[in-house]
Amino acid sequence: MRCPFCAAEETKVVDSRLAADGYQIRRRRECTSCKERFTTFESAELVVPYVIKNNGNRVPFDANKLRVSLSRALEKRPVSADDLEKAISKIIIQLQSTGEREVPSKLVGSLAMDALKQLDKVAYIRFASVYLSFDDIEEFTKEIEKLRE
């Protein structure tokens, strides 16, 4: 692997261990030329299915779009960035494990809601209000009652 500091082609692995989510290997590398150290992450490359939107369009799954949506719901909530990334990784793994080449956007939304329900109930309600298109306070109340059960 090329050194990101001096572009030398030879680096050596100094340390290797499983990353926190268990699906990646974290490696500390050292450049044999400039002696700088850097971290790399190695993971299996699995195909994430296309998403079939409500209008019938098919688009590639965009993890960043999911990250932005969940981050917006979690704004000013006591949830760490690490917990958010773990939730996103879990959603991606669930999508990959369907074995399907295409999944409906409703599945992605449902998985996102399940993840938020586990992370933070307030963020879940925020996300649900947009995702489920709440029209009035009654719909909010019904969803909150479901959470209490």
Curated annotation (Swiss-Prot):
<dbReference type="InterPro" id="IPR003796">
    <property type="entry name" value="RNR_NrdR-like"/>
</dbReference>
<comment type="function">
    <text>Negatively regulates transcription of bacterial ribonucleotide reductase nrd genes and operons by binding to NrdR-boxes.</text>
</comment>
<protein>
    <recommendedName>
        <fullName>Transcriptional repressor NrdR</fullName>
    </recommendedName>
</protein>
<comment type="similarity">
    <text>Belongs to the NrdR family.</text>
</comment>
<dbReference type="GO" id="GO:0003677">
    <property type="term" value="F:DNA binding"/>
</dbReference>
<feature type="domain" description="ATP-cone">
    <location>
        <begin position="49"/>
        <end position="139"/>
    </location>
</feature>
<keyword id="KW-0804">Transcription</keyword>
<dbReference type="GO" id="GO:0008270">
    <property type="term" value="F:zinc ion binding"/>
</dbReference>
<keyword id="KW-0862">Zinc</keyword>
<feature type="zinc finger region">
    <location>
        <begin position="3"/>
        <end position="34"/>
    </location>
</feature>
<dbReference type="GO" id="GO:0005524">
    <property type="term" value="F:ATP binding"/>
</dbReference>
<dbReference type="Pfam" id="PF22811">
    <property type="entry name" value="Zn_ribbon_NrdR"/>
</dbReference>
<keyword id="KW-0863">Zinc-finger</keyword>
<keyword id="KW-0479">Metal-binding</keyword>
<keyword id="KW-0547">Nucleotide-binding</keyword>
<dbReference type="InterPro" id="IPR055173">
    <property type="entry name" value="NrdR-like_N"/>
</dbReference>
<dbReference type="GO" id="GO:0045892">
    <property type="term" value="P:negative regulation of DNA-templated transcription"/>
</dbReference>
<keyword id="KW-0678">Repressor</keyword>
<dbReference type="InterPro" id="IPR005144">
    <property type="entry name" value="ATP-cone_dom"/>
</dbReference>
<keyword id="KW-0067">ATP-binding</keyword>
<keyword id="KW-0805">Transcription regulation</keyword>
<dbReference type="Pfam" id="PF03477">
    <property type="entry name" value="ATP-cone"/>
</dbReference>
<keyword id="KW-0238">DNA-binding</keyword>
